Structure formats: C-alpha cells, structure tokens
C-alpha cells in the first residue's frame, strides 16, 4: 500500500467570507454525472434547470454565503465548559475553607478591632493627618 501525501504547493479549498472565490473547486474528482453536467454547462445556461445550476454550484463551492454566515451552537459548549470549571473551582474553595483553613484569628473580632482602635487613639498615632487627627480628645468622640 502506497501512501500519497498532499502536495501543499497547490492551493487548497477553503470556505471563507473574506475570500469568497477559492482558487480550486470543492469537488476535485468528478463522477460521471458531474462530468456530463460540466459538459452541459458549456452550452447556454438558460437550458439548465434550477437543480442543475445548484449542482454546478455545489461542485465549485461547499457552502453558500447564507450557510457560512449561519450561527453555530458552539457558544453553548463554551458557556457550559466555563460554568463547569467555575463550579468545580467553587467546590474546591468550599472544601478548602472547611478542611484546610483554620478559624479566623481573634484580631478579626469586632471587639478586638475596637480595642486596637482605642489603643491607637490613646497613643495618638499619626496626629497630623491620620487617625488621631479625626478624634476629639475633649469630647471623647469622632470629629464631625
């Protein structure tokens, strides 16, 4: 068995909207009926029926512009795949929060934050433009 490789120096058939007339025909090897139709094509086109004209078109082109411009359902696959990976990631995050990460440190408690803020005010941290500049030390409340 001999394997024949493609000759890539020759043009290939491609249906593209930006290149509407490919250099080669879609059907390379014609059947007997297609050869007879190609001979009939050389005569007057008014003698050809609509089906014969469509068959001649299909010998030259695989798809019409309407078929090339037709929308595909590929977006459903893309959205489905994206949702699958987002859901899988959410499951991993939930598993990590439950089994990997420990409890939050005490410094996240509201009471701890309030004590730390009071300590910073007592130390008068950044009194010019920072936290201490917004605290009224005489009234013991935030400036308005």
Swiss-Prot record:
It holds the Pfam family COX4. It is a single-pass membrane protein. Keywords: Acetylation, Membrane, Mitochondrion, Mitochondrion inner membrane, Phosphoprotein, Transmembrane, Transmembrane helix. The modification Phosphoserine is found at residues 31, 33. The modification N6-succinyllysine is found at residues 4, 35. Residues 1-73 are mitochondrial matrix. Gene3D superfamilies: Cytochrome c oxidase subunit IV. The chain crosses the membrane at residues 74-99. This is Cytochrome c oxidase subunit 4 isoform 1, mitochondrial. The lineage of its organism: Eukaryota, Metazoa, Chordata, Craniata, Vertebrata. The gene is COX4I1.
């Amino acid at each position: 068995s001999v394997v024949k490789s493609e000759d890539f120096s020759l043009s290939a058939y491609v249906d593209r909207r930006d290149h509407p007339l490919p250099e080669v025909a879609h059907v390379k090897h014609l059947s007997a009926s297609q050869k007879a139709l190609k001979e009939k094509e050389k005569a007057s086109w008014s003698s050809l029926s609509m089906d014969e004209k469509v068959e001649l078109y299909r010998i030259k082109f695989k798809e019409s512009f309407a078929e090339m411009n037709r929308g595909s359902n590929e977006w459903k696959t893309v959205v489905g795949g994206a949702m699958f990976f987002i859901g899988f990631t959410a499951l991993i995050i939930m598993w990590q929060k439950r089994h990997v990460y420990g409890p939050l440190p005490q410094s996240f408690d509201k009471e701890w934050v309030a004590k730390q803020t009071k300590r910073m005010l007592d130390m008068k941290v950044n009194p010019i433009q920072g936290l201490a500049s917004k605290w009224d030390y005489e009234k013991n409340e935030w400036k308005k």
